From Swiss-Prot:
Function recorded in the entry: Binds to the 23S rRNA.
Protein name (database record): Large ribosomal subunit protein bL9
Keyword annotations: Ribonucleoprotein, Ribosomal protein, RNA-binding, rRNA-binding
Keyword Transport annotated: no
Biological processes annotated in GO: translation
Pfam families in the cross-refs: Ribosomal_L9_C (PF03948), Ribosomal_L9_N (PF01281)
GO cellular component, one term: ribosome
Gene expressing this chain: rplI
Amino acid sequence: MQIILLEKVANLGNLGDIVKVKDGYARNFLIPNRKARRATKDAIAEFEVRRAELEKVAAEKLAAAQAVGEKLNGQTFEITQKSGVDGRLFGSVTNGDVAELLKKAGYEIEKAQVRMPEGPLKMIGEHGVQVALHTDVLVDVTVNVIGDHA
């Protein structure tokens, strides 16, 4: 299916690009989330009329994400979990736990925005975590897992 991207989509393209994607990806994700429209002649003409408005909105989103990123970059957050004597956690710290921790600190972060390269945290200590605020804004934060010996 041919679609017009209404915003930048990772691994796909930028605002205004006409790309071919699988039908299911377009119907189930891109179109319902208002990231794209079908590339019909009418839609292309309407997009060209609204292009400046959409670019302005995209620039505002990027600026807002960069402002939050400057505040968030390099910060350290602490979370307490039950652990054994050897430093291993009972359970783990997931991206949902980190997102909840950031929300309590006053940041609007969804769990899908938290990237944990090594998977869930299973040991006490400091761990690096990435937060994707925008497709162009990746921020590194440190999560210090404190063990609560049971």
